[in-house]
Curated annotation (Swiss-Prot):
Protein purpose: The glycine cleavage system catalyzes the degradation of glycine.
Family named by the database record: Belongs to the GcvT family.
Organism whose genome encodes this protein: Desulfitobacterium hafniense (strain DSM 10664 / DCB-2)
Protein's name in the database: Aminomethyltransferase
Any Pfam family matching the protein: GCV_T
Record's GO cellular component terms: cytosol; glycine cleavage complex
Annotated catalysed reactions: N(6)-[(R)-S(8)-aminomethyldihydrolipoyl]-L-lysyl-[protein] + (6S)-5,6,7,8-tetrahydrofolate = N(6)-[(R)-dihydrolipoyl]-L-lysyl-[protein] + (6R)-5,10-methylene-5,6,7,8-tetrahydrofolate + NH4(+)
Length: 365
């Protein structure tokens, strides 16, 4: 049996009594106080996440921008230094290798942040596409710990530990600066649908930083949050999860991410397939569902209409914010009308669900 990898915060999680699970080969906290309580803490106050398992790839060289324009579906030329962009990374068939964040230091220097379980695969994919480009790629995943502080009180809490004016960091921008005396990269990003920050720092400083944020944020009610609530938070905000809403057999257009596919761009991997799909119309569409009858629709459960299988669930759970069972499903567009009822097959039994708008939660302001 392969030994599970651990983040620099493993001892903090263990001491806090977190329930630990195998997540993509990492031993990670799935919950502390409980998923619903943690979820509500992030929506109403603040939560601190260990996301040190995420992968980081450093890209340098004079062709860095041209390489990213070829590698990714989004238009990386649109971002400035210290700005961040989200993009799918596709195969020539239009399926998704991964979705990632692009941090631009300069025209010749970028940091790419990828999903933990895909890090090695992504790095190999990037290297395989690099021929003919004057660039260097380095897997820097072991050099960074990453903490995410999310929720309406995130800025107020983090501001106690830094002299930088955090209000000056706009959404999807980043700065380098000291937090509690440690030089960090701080970005206004997250995976919860709330305001918040992601803090990149040397692994040896992560345990103290974790403890300090929980300490100074105590009066605001900050809590440590596990991967269980991270999933329900992102799901309510309709943020895709690789392996669920995205994958080698699902295109960004099917997943409703057409905004991040710039077909007017020069040649990029997947352009031909995605252009053809857009012209022809997507064969499947991601829809929101609410359960009418009792039951939770889980990933990969079949979806039927009048006894005919038409698609499957990508994600589903109880929504602590809406206080009902909801799901996302991938079905042909002709069935995708709001109000349409479908059957979710749960343990062999047909359970009724209704199609609703898929952005289940959007924060105010």
């Amino acid at each position: 049996m392969t030994e599970l990898k651990r983040t620099p915060l493993y001892e903090q999680h263990r001491r806090a009594g977190a329930k630990l699970i195998d997540f993509g080969g990492w031993e990670m906290p799935v919950q502390y106080a409980g998923v619903i309580e943690e979820h509500k803490a992030v929506r109403s106050k603040a939560g601190l996440f260990d996301v040190s398992h995420m992968g980081e790839v450093e890209l340098k060289g004079k062709d860095s921008l041209a390489f990213l324009q070829y590698l990714l579906t989004n238009d990386v030329s649109r971002i400035q230094d210290n700005q961040i962009q989200y993009s799918p990374m596709c195969t020539s068939a239009g399926g998704v290798v991964d979705d990632l964040l692009v941090y631009r230091y300069s025209r010749e220097h970028f940091l790419l942040v990828v999903n933990a379980s895909n890090t090695d695969k992504d790095f190999a994919w990037m290297q395989a596409q690099a021929e003919g480009f004057e660039i260097s790629l380095e897997n820097r995943s072991g050099d960074f710990a990453q903490l995410a502080l999310q929720g309406p009180w995130a800025e107020k809490i983090l501001q106690k530990l830094t002299s930088m004016d955090l209000a000056q960091i706009n959404y999807y921008w980043f700065k380098h600066g000291e937090v509690d005396g440690v030089l960090c990269l701080i970005s206004r990003t997250g995976y919860t649908g709330e305001d918040g920050f992601e803090i990149y720092l040397p692994p040896e400083h992560a345990p103290r930083m974790w403890e300090r944020i929980l300490e100074v944020g105590g009066s605001e009610g900050v809590q440590p949050i596990g991967l269980g609530a991270r999933d329900t938070l992102r799901f309510e905000a309709r943020l895709p999860l690789y392996g669920n809403e995205l994958g080698p057999d699902i295109t960004p257009l099917e997943a409703g991410l057409g905004f991040f596919v710039k077909l007017e761009k020069d040649n990029f991997i997947g352009k031909e397939a995605l252009s053809a799909q857009k012209e022809k119309g997507v064969p499947r569409k991601l829809v929101g569902l609410e359960m009418i009858e009792r039951g939770i629709a889980r990933s990969h459960y079949p979806l039927q209409k009048e006894g005919k299988e038409i698609g499957f669930i990508t994600s589903g759970s109880f929504s602590p914010t809406l206080n009902k069972n909801i799901a996302l499903g991938l079905i042909p567009p002709e069935y995708a009308q709001i109000g349409e009822t479908l059957d979710v097959i749960i343990r062999g039994k047909a359970v009724k669900a209704r199609i609703i708008p898929s952005l289940f939660y959007k924060r105010q302001g």
